[in-house]
Amino acid sequence: MLDYIKSAHDEMTEVAGHGRSAMIDKAAAKLKSDGWKLVETTGFLHLIGPLWQRVVDGAHEYALVTEDKHHNRNGLVQGGVLMTFADRTCGMTAHYVSGKRPLATVQLDTHFVEAGKIGDILISRPRVVRSTRSLIFMSTEVTVDDRCIVMANGVFKFLKGPE
């Protein structure tokens, strides 16, 4: 099985590898020119990023340019990348709108609507559905060129700590 996965990866890299870096650089330049800023990330998210962010009319928006490292064995964006992007962007927005209170995901419902392709620019525009003293309910659609590819709803618990 591992040989099959390695073989599929090698074939995809050969087909898609040439010019991939230029495509990523072009997407990054487009994001910068549209007012996006790089988000400093650490830990697991650092492996998936770079992540981009901007605020438009008070609403937080996030972008991720999909690269070869995000592919599954079918050459499409791996579902875990899409889930992580939805979770992280909902969590970041919840953190900002709550006055930077610490929080943790307690539930994330994810619906895959369409496949993401390597080279796509994923966009997430999370919104608060409801907030209580201990929980905040978030929702987002992950889009590519205004087409919804993922719908996600998350529940986040506020943690004790600096408020």
Task: List PLM regions with ranges.
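Terminal targeting signals and extreme-terminal segments of soluble enzymes
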Residues: 1-163
